[in-house]
């Protein structure tokens, strides 16, 4: 009886569990087994059940990205070259000054869009700095606070760093991986990505306006009867029904005469539809990006903070800091904010 009671007593004692911290190399004594634990010296977080790296679909993802990059580059060149071929003979026929003005505008927007696209596609998205790890004498107290170990790169990974399996590297302040540029958007090229979106939205909006302006000068005139004149008169007074009726009559007239429409007109119509569609999509993306920057977040940090009480500091300073504005401008922001609070009270 004594042996059995003694054996049951020993079985209830919890044995200490030893583990090694990858950050400083110290042997840690844990009260029990824990799949994830944090070192009390260096602050590194160790995951004892790491996810095994997968490299099977790496080549397929890279091939997909290259295809998207080629498609986007061809589309941009088609919009530029197709617009020049279809619109500029008409613009120069209106007046020489008109043609020169739009030529300079097109060249400026094309250079801006293509240069920012090249920068965001080929510039490093943000390689994290190398940091010493693995040896206790070289790693100070709290030097690797909240760092984790990337099993893909076999390097330390800071809380602001995420690994991209498509690019095959860790990216500092990673926002997302964009297949249309074949690159990640991170600390190294985020500003160029925003500049590319702004330039692309302005360029596509300008292309849509120029397509409409050119089509007005080359499409056959509409037969204007008494009903058409009456509808136009009501449009002048803001009648929405008359506006829809006028647009309907114009569309039906051009559809009926589609056989007589030139190839130049068809190209302009396609460019208009494509430009408007792309401009709307990029405008939504640009607004989303600026909203995250205003909140002091990235897209990935926004996803990770969902369902929690973590909320970034919403301030215009985040936008000014992101774009590298001088500190003299930031000094006036608290004054403006305080004035708004005083007016509210």
Swiss-Prot record:
Name of the gene: PAT11
Originating species: Arabidopsis thaliana
Catalytic reactions of this protein: L-cysteinyl-[protein] + hexadecanoyl-CoA = S-hexadecanoyl-L-cysteinyl-[protein] + CoA
Entry text on domains: The DHHC domain is required for palmitoyltransferase activity.
Location of the DHHC domain: 148-198
Membrane topology: Multi-pass membrane protein
Matches recorded under Pfam families: DHHC
E.C. numbers: 2.3.1.225
Active-site residues, as the UniProt record annotates them: 178 (s-palmitoyl cysteine intermediate)
Protein known as: Protein S-acyltransferase 11
Location of the protein in the cell: Vacuole membrane
TM annotation in the entry: 67-87, 91-111, 192-212, 266-286
């Amino acid at each position: 009886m004594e042996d059995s009671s003694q054996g049951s007593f020993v079985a209830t004692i919890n044995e200490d569990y030893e583990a090694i911290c990858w950050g400083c190399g110290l042997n840690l004594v844990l009260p029990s087994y824990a799949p994830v634990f944090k070192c009390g010296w260096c602050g590194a977080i160790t995951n004892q059940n790491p996810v095994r790296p997968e490299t099977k679909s790496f080549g397929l993802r890279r091939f997909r990205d290259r295809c998207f990059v080629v498609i986007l580059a061809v589309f941009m060149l088609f919009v530029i070259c197709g617009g020049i071929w279809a619109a500029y003979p008409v613009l120069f026929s209106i007046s020489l000054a008109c043609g020169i003005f739009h030529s300079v505008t097109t060249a400026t927007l094309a250079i801006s869009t293509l240069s920012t696209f090249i920068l965001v596609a080929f510039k490093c998205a943000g390689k994290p700095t190398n940091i010493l790890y693995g040896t206790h004498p070289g790693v100070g107290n709290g030097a690797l606070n909240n760092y984790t170990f990337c099993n893909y790169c076999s390097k330390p990974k800071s809380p602001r760093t995420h690994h991209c399996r498509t690019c095959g590297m860790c990216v500092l302040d990673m926002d997302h991986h964009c297949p249309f540029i074949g690159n990640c958007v991170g600390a190294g090229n985020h500003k160029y990505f925003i500049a590319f979106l702004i330039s692309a939205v302005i360029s596509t909006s300008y292309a849509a306006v120029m397509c409409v302006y050119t089509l007005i000068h080359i499409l056959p005139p509409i037969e204007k009867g008494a009903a058409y004149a009456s509808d136009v008169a009501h449009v002048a007074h803001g009648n929405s029904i008359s506006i829809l009726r006028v647009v309907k009559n114009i569309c039906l007239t051009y559809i009926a005469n589609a056989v007589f429409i030139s190839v130049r007109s068809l190209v302009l119509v396609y460019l208009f539809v494509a430009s408007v569609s792309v401009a709307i999509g990029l405008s939504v993306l640009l607004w989303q990006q600026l909203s995250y920057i205003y909140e002091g977040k990235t897209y990935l940090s926004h996803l990770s903070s969902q369902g929690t009480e973590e909320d970034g500091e919403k301030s215009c300073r985040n936008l000014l800091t992101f774009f590298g504005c001088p500190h003299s401008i930031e000094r006036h922001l608290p004054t403006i904010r305080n004035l708004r609070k005083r007016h509210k009270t």
